Amino acid sequence: MPSPQGRVSLVAFNPFDHRGIPIDDQIRNWGQLDVAPIDPDNADPYTKCRIITMNGIEAEAIMFSHHFARVCPDLDTRQLLAKVRYVEQQQQKLVNWLLPGQASVLETTLSYEQVATDLTGWVARMEPDPYLKACYEFGLLEDFDHLYRYANLYEMIEHRKAEKIVDGLTEVMPGRPTYQQHRDPLDNVRQPYDRETAAPLSKLHALTIMAAEQQTMNFYMNMGPLYMEPIARQLYQEIGMVEEEHVTHYESMLDPHETWYERLVNHEYNECYLYYSFMQTESDPRIKGFWELHLNMELEHLRLACDLMRRAEDRDPEAMLPRELPEPVTFEQNKTYIRQLLATQIDYTTLGTGIVQEAHERFEAMQDRINAERPSTEIVIDEHRHKFGEEYRLETEGPHPVPRLREKPYQ
Protein backbone atom coordinates (compact mmCIF):
# COMPACT_ATOMS: atom_id res chain seq x y z
CA MET A 1 0.00 0.00 0.00
CA PRO A 2 1.59 3.29 -1.04
CA SER A 3 1.83 6.14 1.40
CA PRO A 4 -0.97 8.73 1.24
CA GLN A 5 -0.19 11.45 -1.27
CA GLY A 6 0.55 14.25 1.16
CA ARG A 7 -0.47 14.14 4.80
CA VAL A 8 -3.72 15.85 5.68
CA SER A 9 -3.45 19.10 7.61
CA LEU A 10 -5.50 19.62 10.76
CA VAL A 11 -6.65 23.06 9.60
CA ALA A 12 -9.71 23.89 7.45
CA PHE A 13 -9.79 21.15 4.86
CA ASN A 14 -11.30 21.15 1.37
CA PRO A 15 -11.82 17.53 0.23
CA PHE A 16 -12.20 18.61 -3.39
CA ASP A 17 -8.60 19.83 -3.45
CA HIS A 18 -7.10 16.40 -2.64
CA ARG A 19 -7.01 13.38 -4.93
CA GLY A 20 -6.05 10.88 -2.27
CA ILE A 21 -4.81 7.39 -3.16
CA PRO A 22 -5.55 6.25 -6.75
CA ILE A 23 -8.33 3.66 -6.78
CA ASP A 24 -6.13 1.03 -8.44
CA ASP A 25 -3.70 1.25 -5.51
CA GLN A 26 -6.29 0.83 -2.76
CA ILE A 27 -6.78 -2.95 -2.57
CA ARG A 28 -4.98 -4.47 0.42
CA ASN A 29 -3.71 -8.01 0.93
CA TRP A 30 -4.82 -10.31 3.74
CA GLY A 31 -1.90 -9.39 5.94
CA GLN A 32 -2.75 -5.70 5.70
CA LEU A 33 -6.36 -6.39 6.65
CA ASP A 34 -5.43 -8.64 9.59
CA VAL A 35 -5.18 -5.87 12.16
CA ALA A 36 -4.73 -6.27 15.90
CA PRO A 37 -7.90 -5.35 17.80
CA ILE A 38 -8.02 -2.67 20.45
CA ASP A 39 -7.34 -3.62 24.07
CA PRO A 40 -10.76 -4.29 25.65
CA ASP A 41 -9.55 -3.26 29.11
CA ASN A 42 -7.54 -0.13 28.37
CA ALA A 43 -8.93 1.40 25.16
CA ASP A 44 -10.63 4.78 25.31
CA PRO A 45 -14.42 4.08 25.26
CA TYR A 46 -14.78 6.74 22.60
CA THR A 47 -12.22 4.94 20.41
CA LYS A 48 -14.58 1.98 20.47
CA CYS A 49 -17.47 4.34 19.69
CA ARG A 50 -15.62 5.72 16.67
CA ILE A 51 -14.96 2.18 15.43
CA ILE A 52 -18.63 1.23 15.79
CA THR A 53 -19.70 4.43 14.03
CA MET A 54 -17.40 3.94 11.05
CA ASN A 55 -18.44 0.31 10.74
CA GLY A 56 -22.03 1.52 10.38
CA ILE A 57 -21.00 4.22 7.92
CA GLU A 58 -19.11 1.73 5.74
CA ALA A 59 -21.97 -0.79 5.91
CA GLU A 60 -24.39 1.89 4.71
CA ALA A 61 -22.02 2.89 1.90
CA ILE A 62 -21.81 -0.74 0.77
CA MET A 63 -25.54 -1.38 0.80
CA PHE A 64 -26.33 1.95 -0.85
CA SER A 65 -23.90 1.08 -3.65
CA HIS A 66 -25.57 -2.32 -4.11
CA HIS A 67 -29.02 -0.73 -4.28
CA PHE A 68 -27.78 1.87 -6.77
CA ALA A 69 -26.27 -0.86 -8.95
CA ARG A 70 -29.57 -2.76 -9.02
CA VAL A 71 -31.42 0.15 -10.62
CA CYS A 72 -28.63 1.58 -12.79
CA PRO A 73 -28.70 0.65 -16.51
CA ASP A 74 -25.27 2.13 -17.29
CA LEU A 75 -22.56 -0.55 -17.38
CA ASP A 76 -19.66 1.84 -16.80
CA THR A 77 -21.32 3.22 -13.68
CA ARG A 78 -22.09 -0.25 -12.33
CA GLN A 79 -18.49 -1.32 -12.90
CA LEU A 80 -17.10 1.70 -11.10
CA LEU A 81 -19.55 1.17 -8.25
CA ALA A 82 -18.31 -2.41 -7.97
CA LYS A 83 -14.69 -1.29 -7.95
CA VAL A 84 -15.19 1.28 -5.20
CA ARG A 85 -17.53 -1.01 -3.27
CA TYR A 86 -14.87 -3.71 -3.05
CA VAL A 87 -12.58 -1.22 -1.34
CA GLU A 88 -15.42 -0.11 0.94
CA GLN A 89 -15.85 -3.75 1.94
CA GLN A 90 -12.17 -3.96 2.82
CA GLN A 91 -12.48 -0.78 4.84
CA GLN A 92 -15.46 -2.21 6.71
CA LYS A 93 -13.58 -5.43 7.44
CA LEU A 94 -10.59 -3.60 8.87
CA VAL A 95 -12.70 -1.22 10.94
CA ASN A 96 -15.06 -3.80 12.41
CA TRP A 97 -12.21 -6.25 13.05
CA LEU A 98 -10.65 -3.66 15.36
CA LEU A 99 -13.26 -4.69 17.93
CA PRO A 100 -11.82 -7.17 20.43
CA GLY A 101 -12.98 -10.77 20.41
CA GLN A 102 -12.76 -10.87 24.20
CA ALA A 103 -15.65 -8.41 24.47
CA SER A 104 -19.01 -10.10 24.93
CA VAL A 105 -22.01 -9.29 22.75
CA LEU A 106 -23.53 -7.38 25.66
CA GLU A 107 -20.37 -5.34 26.17
CA THR A 108 -20.39 -4.39 22.50
CA THR A 109 -24.11 -3.63 22.81
CA LEU A 110 -23.41 -1.17 25.62
CA SER A 111 -20.90 0.57 23.36
CA TYR A 112 -23.47 0.66 20.54
CA GLU A 113 -25.87 2.47 22.86
CA GLN A 114 -23.12 4.80 24.03
CA VAL A 115 -22.67 5.69 20.34
CA ALA A 116 -26.40 6.24 19.97
CA THR A 117 -26.39 8.51 23.01
CA ASP A 118 -23.30 10.64 22.55
CA LEU A 119 -23.17 10.77 18.74
CA THR A 120 -26.84 11.73 18.52
CA GLY A 121 -26.32 14.18 21.37
CA TRP A 122 -23.52 15.92 19.50
CA VAL A 123 -25.49 16.00 16.24
CA ALA A 124 -28.58 17.37 17.98
CA ARG A 125 -26.56 20.17 19.56
CA MET A 126 -24.98 21.11 16.22
CA GLU A 127 -28.04 20.72 13.96
CA PRO A 128 -29.08 24.11 12.46
CA ASP A 129 -32.62 23.09 11.43
CA PRO A 130 -35.10 23.32 14.36
CA TYR A 131 -37.34 20.50 13.12
CA LEU A 132 -34.45 18.10 12.47
CA LYS A 133 -32.91 19.06 15.82
CA ALA A 134 -36.17 18.11 17.54
CA CYS A 135 -36.12 14.77 15.72
CA TYR A 136 -32.62 14.00 17.00
CA GLU A 137 -33.53 15.01 20.53
CA PHE A 138 -36.57 12.76 20.37
CA GLY A 139 -34.55 9.70 19.35
CA LEU A 140 -31.76 10.50 21.79
CA LEU A 141 -33.95 10.05 24.87
CA GLU A 142 -35.04 6.65 23.59
CA ASP A 143 -31.57 5.24 22.95
CA PHE A 144 -30.47 6.65 26.30
CA ASP A 145 -33.10 4.41 27.91
CA HIS A 146 -31.86 1.37 25.99
CA LEU A 147 -28.42 1.83 27.54
CA TYR A 148 -30.03 1.65 30.99
CA ARG A 149 -32.00 -1.53 30.18
CA TYR A 150 -28.98 -3.33 28.70
CA ALA A 151 -26.80 -2.25 31.64
CA ASN A 152 -29.17 -3.98 34.03
CA LEU A 153 -29.16 -7.12 31.88
CA TYR A 154 -25.34 -6.99 31.76
CA GLU A 155 -24.99 -7.09 35.53
CA MET A 156 -27.58 -9.86 35.82
CA ILE A 157 -25.97 -12.13 33.22
CA GLU A 158 -22.27 -11.30 33.40
CA HIS A 159 -22.07 -9.96 36.98
CA ARG A 160 -20.19 -6.87 35.84
CA LYS A 161 -21.09 -3.21 35.86
CA ALA A 162 -21.54 -1.00 32.82
CA GLU A 163 -19.28 1.72 34.23
CA LYS A 164 -16.41 -0.50 33.08
CA ILE A 165 -17.64 0.04 29.51
CA VAL A 166 -18.87 3.65 29.49
CA ASP A 167 -16.14 4.81 31.91
CA GLY A 168 -18.29 7.50 33.49
CA LEU A 169 -18.47 9.44 30.21
CA THR A 170 -22.16 8.64 29.77
CA GLU A 171 -24.69 8.36 32.57
CA VAL A 172 -26.85 5.25 32.90
CA MET A 173 -30.40 5.89 34.08
CA PRO A 174 -33.92 5.82 32.62
CA GLY A 175 -34.73 7.81 29.52
CA ARG A 176 -38.12 7.76 27.83
CA PRO A 177 -39.22 4.28 29.00
CA THR A 178 -38.83 1.79 26.18
CA TYR A 179 -42.34 0.40 26.56
CA GLN A 180 -43.63 3.88 25.67
CA GLN A 181 -41.55 3.93 22.48
CA HIS A 182 -43.77 1.49 20.57
CA ARG A 183 -45.79 3.62 18.17
CA ASP A 184 -48.04 3.05 15.20
CA PRO A 185 -45.72 2.81 12.15
CA LEU A 186 -47.55 5.72 10.52
CA ASP A 187 -46.21 7.96 13.27
CA ASN A 188 -42.57 7.04 12.68
CA VAL A 189 -42.27 8.82 9.31
CA ARG A 190 -40.86 12.35 9.49
CA GLN A 191 -40.83 15.25 7.03
CA PRO A 192 -37.68 15.25 4.85
CA TYR A 193 -35.33 18.16 4.51
CA ASP A 194 -35.47 20.05 1.20
CA ARG A 195 -32.45 19.18 -0.94
CA GLU A 196 -32.48 22.66 -2.48
CA THR A 197 -32.55 24.68 0.74
CA ALA A 198 -31.21 22.43 3.52
CA ALA A 199 -27.85 23.26 5.04
CA PRO A 200 -25.21 20.79 3.84
CA LEU A 201 -24.50 19.95 7.48
CA SER A 202 -28.11 18.80 7.89
CA LYS A 203 -27.66 16.33 5.04
CA LEU A 204 -24.49 14.93 6.61
CA HIS A 205 -26.11 14.64 10.02
CA ALA A 206 -29.08 12.72 8.63
CA LEU A 207 -26.86 10.28 6.74
CA THR A 208 -24.66 9.73 9.78
CA ILE A 209 -27.37 9.00 12.33
CA MET A 210 -29.40 6.92 9.87
CA ALA A 211 -26.35 4.73 9.18
CA ALA A 212 -25.51 4.38 12.87
CA GLU A 213 -29.07 3.40 13.79
CA GLN A 214 -29.28 1.01 10.84
CA GLN A 215 -26.13 -0.75 12.01
CA THR A 216 -27.58 -1.03 15.52
CA MET A 217 -30.80 -2.49 14.12
CA ASN A 218 -28.88 -5.07 12.09
CA PHE A 219 -26.62 -5.94 15.04
CA TYR A 220 -29.61 -6.68 17.29
CA MET A 221 -31.38 -8.60 14.52
CA ASN A 222 -28.44 -10.98 14.29
CA MET A 223 -27.10 -11.12 17.84
CA GLY A 224 -30.34 -11.33 19.84
CA PRO A 225 -31.21 -14.98 19.14
CA LEU A 226 -27.69 -16.16 20.05
CA TYR A 227 -28.49 -15.83 23.76
CA MET A 228 -29.82 -18.73 25.80
CA GLU A 229 -31.30 -16.62 28.62
CA PRO A 230 -34.98 -15.86 27.87
CA ILE A 231 -34.81 -12.33 29.26
CA ALA A 232 -31.85 -11.49 27.00
CA ARG A 233 -33.59 -12.87 23.92
CA GLN A 234 -36.72 -10.93 24.77
CA LEU A 235 -34.85 -7.69 25.47
CA TYR A 236 -32.97 -7.74 22.16
CA GLN A 237 -36.23 -8.49 20.38
CA GLU A 238 -38.11 -5.59 21.96
CA ILE A 239 -35.35 -3.01 21.60
CA GLY A 240 -34.67 -4.32 18.09
CA MET A 241 -38.22 -3.38 17.14
CA VAL A 242 -37.63 0.14 18.41
CA GLU A 243 -34.52 0.32 16.24
CA GLU A 244 -36.77 -0.43 13.26
CA GLU A 245 -38.78 2.62 14.28
CA HIS A 246 -35.62 4.68 14.59
CA VAL A 247 -34.31 3.75 11.14
CA THR A 248 -37.69 4.73 9.69
CA HIS A 249 -37.56 7.97 11.71
CA TYR A 250 -34.11 8.96 10.45
CA GLU A 251 -34.21 7.71 6.86
CA SER A 252 -37.43 9.64 6.25
CA MET A 253 -35.54 12.86 7.04
CA LEU A 254 -33.58 12.50 3.77
CA ASP A 255 -35.10 14.18 0.71
CA PRO A 256 -36.41 11.40 -1.58
CA HIS A 257 -36.01 13.72 -4.57
CA GLU A 258 -32.22 13.48 -4.42
CA THR A 259 -30.96 11.62 -7.48
CA TRP A 260 -28.94 8.44 -7.14
CA TYR A 261 -25.79 10.26 -8.23
CA GLU A 262 -26.46 13.07 -5.79
CA ARG A 263 -26.86 10.54 -2.98
CA LEU A 264 -23.63 8.84 -4.00
CA VAL A 265 -21.72 12.11 -3.74
CA ASN A 266 -23.33 12.83 -0.36
CA HIS A 267 -22.29 9.41 0.92
CA GLU A 268 -18.70 9.83 -0.18
CA TYR A 269 -18.46 13.39 1.13
CA ASN A 270 -19.85 12.24 4.48
CA GLU A 271 -17.27 9.47 4.71
CA CYS A 272 -14.52 12.03 4.11
CA TYR A 273 -16.05 14.23 6.79
CA LEU A 274 -16.22 11.48 9.40
CA TYR A 275 -12.79 9.99 8.77
CA TYR A 276 -11.35 13.49 8.90
CA SER A 277 -13.25 14.21 12.12
CA PHE A 278 -12.10 11.05 13.84
CA MET A 279 -8.54 11.48 12.62
CA GLN A 280 -8.49 14.79 14.50
CA THR A 281 -10.08 13.55 17.71
CA GLU A 282 -8.67 10.00 18.00
CA SER A 283 -6.60 9.37 21.14
CA ASP A 284 -4.98 6.12 19.94
CA PRO A 285 -2.13 6.86 17.46
CA ARG A 286 -2.45 3.47 15.76
CA ILE A 287 -6.17 3.84 15.16
CA LYS A 288 -5.67 7.43 14.06
CA GLY A 289 -3.40 6.08 11.32
CA PHE A 290 -6.25 3.93 9.99
CA TRP A 291 -8.60 6.92 9.95
CA GLU A 292 -6.04 8.93 7.97
CA LEU A 293 -5.44 6.09 5.51
CA HIS A 294 -9.16 5.62 4.92
CA LEU A 295 -9.64 9.36 4.51
CA ASN A 296 -7.10 9.35 1.71
CA MET A 297 -9.01 6.49 0.08
CA GLU A 298 -12.34 8.28 0.45
CA LEU A 299 -10.97 11.43 -1.16
CA GLU A 300 -10.50 9.40 -4.34
CA HIS A 301 -13.96 7.85 -3.97
CA LEU A 302 -15.43 11.34 -3.70
CA ARG A 303 -13.57 12.47 -6.82
CA LEU A 304 -14.88 9.48 -8.78
CA ALA A 305 -18.44 10.03 -7.55
CA CYS A 306 -18.27 13.68 -8.58
CA ASP A 307 -17.03 12.69 -12.04
CA LEU A 308 -19.94 10.24 -12.39
CA MET A 309 -22.45 12.93 -11.45
CA ARG A 310 -20.98 15.42 -13.90
CA ARG A 311 -21.11 12.87 -16.70
CA ALA A 312 -24.60 11.53 -15.94
CA GLU A 313 -26.41 14.73 -14.95
CA ASP A 314 -24.25 17.56 -16.32
CA ARG A 315 -24.27 19.15 -12.86
CA ASP A 316 -21.42 20.36 -10.69
CA PRO A 317 -21.52 18.39 -7.41
CA GLU A 318 -19.18 20.86 -5.76
CA ALA A 319 -21.94 23.46 -5.92
CA MET A 320 -24.13 21.49 -3.51
CA LEU A 321 -21.52 20.84 -0.81
CA PRO A 322 -19.26 23.10 1.24
CA ARG A 323 -15.73 23.68 0.03
CA GLU A 324 -14.46 23.15 3.57
CA LEU A 325 -15.48 20.33 5.87
CA PRO A 326 -17.69 21.39 8.80
CA GLU A 327 -16.54 21.37 12.41
CA PRO A 328 -15.34 17.83 13.23
CA VAL A 329 -17.84 15.38 14.67
CA THR A 330 -16.73 14.83 18.25
CA PHE A 331 -17.50 12.17 20.83
CA GLU A 332 -17.79 14.03 24.12
CA GLN A 333 -19.95 14.08 27.22
CA ASN A 334 -23.55 15.24 26.83
CA LYS A 335 -24.66 14.83 30.44
CA THR A 336 -26.02 18.33 31.06
CA TYR A 337 -27.76 18.44 27.68
CA ILE A 338 -29.41 15.05 28.18
CA ARG A 339 -30.57 15.99 31.67
CA GLN A 340 -32.18 19.14 30.25
CA LEU A 341 -33.99 17.06 27.64
CA LEU A 342 -35.12 14.53 30.23
CA ALA A 343 -36.58 17.32 32.35
CA THR A 344 -38.56 18.80 29.45
CA GLN A 345 -39.24 16.11 26.81
CA ILE A 346 -39.62 12.79 28.62
CA ASP A 347 -43.36 12.49 27.79
CA TYR A 348 -43.14 13.31 24.08
CA THR A 349 -44.46 10.99 21.39
CA THR A 350 -45.22 11.45 17.69
CA LEU A 351 -48.36 12.08 15.66
CA GLY A 352 -48.00 11.95 11.91
CA THR A 353 -44.77 13.75 11.06
CA GLY A 354 -44.89 15.88 14.20
CA ILE A 355 -43.69 15.49 17.78
CA VAL A 356 -46.38 16.01 20.42
CA GLN A 357 -46.65 15.92 24.20
CA GLU A 358 -50.04 14.29 24.57
CA ALA A 359 -50.88 10.63 24.01
CA HIS A 360 -53.44 10.11 21.24
CA GLU A 361 -55.82 7.41 20.09
CA ARG A 362 -53.46 5.76 17.59
CA PHE A 363 -50.60 5.72 20.11
CA GLU A 364 -52.79 4.26 22.84
CA ALA A 365 -54.17 1.58 20.51
CA MET A 366 -50.63 0.47 19.62
CA GLN A 367 -49.64 0.50 23.28
CA ASP A 368 -52.62 -1.64 24.27
CA ARG A 369 -51.91 -4.14 21.53
CA ILE A 370 -48.15 -4.61 21.77
CA ASN A 371 -47.91 -4.25 25.57
CA ALA A 372 -50.77 -6.65 26.29
CA GLU A 373 -48.18 -8.63 28.27
CA ARG A 374 -45.58 -6.94 30.48
CA PRO A 375 -42.67 -5.95 28.21
CA SER A 376 -39.18 -7.34 28.67
CA THR A 377 -37.72 -3.86 29.17
CA GLU A 378 -39.71 -3.59 32.40
CA ILE A 379 -39.18 -7.22 33.41
CA VAL A 380 -35.39 -6.85 33.22
CA ILE A 381 -35.53 -4.06 35.81
CA ASP A 382 -37.90 -6.10 37.99
CA GLU A 383 -35.55 -9.07 37.88
CA HIS A 384 -32.49 -6.96 38.60
CA ARG A 385 -34.18 -5.40 41.64
CA HIS A 386 -35.25 -8.84 42.85
CA LYS A 387 -31.73 -10.24 42.45
CA PHE A 388 -29.67 -7.31 43.75
CA GLY A 389 -32.19 -5.32 45.79
CA GLU A 390 -31.79 -2.29 43.51
CA GLU A 391 -31.51 -1.18 39.91
CA TYR A 392 -28.21 -0.60 38.17
CA ARG A 393 -27.66 3.10 37.59
CA LEU A 394 -24.70 5.38 37.01
CA GLU A 395 -25.91 8.84 38.02
CA THR A 396 -22.75 10.93 38.19
CA GLU A 397 -24.46 14.34 38.18
CA GLY A 398 -27.03 13.84 40.92
CA PRO A 399 -30.57 12.43 41.17
CA HIS A 400 -32.62 11.82 38.05
CA PRO A 401 -34.06 15.14 36.79
CA VAL A 402 -37.55 13.59 36.55
CA PRO A 403 -38.74 12.86 40.11
CA ARG A 404 -41.01 9.95 39.16
CA LEU A 405 -38.08 8.18 37.48
CA ARG A 406 -35.85 8.32 40.55
CA GLU A 407 -35.09 4.93 42.02
CA LYS A 408 -37.49 3.81 44.71
CA PRO A 409 -36.54 1.54 47.64
CA TYR A 410 -37.04 -2.13 46.84
CA GLN A 411 -39.78 -3.74 48.90
Language-model-detected regions and their locations in the chain:
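Non-heme di-metal
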Residues: 2-411
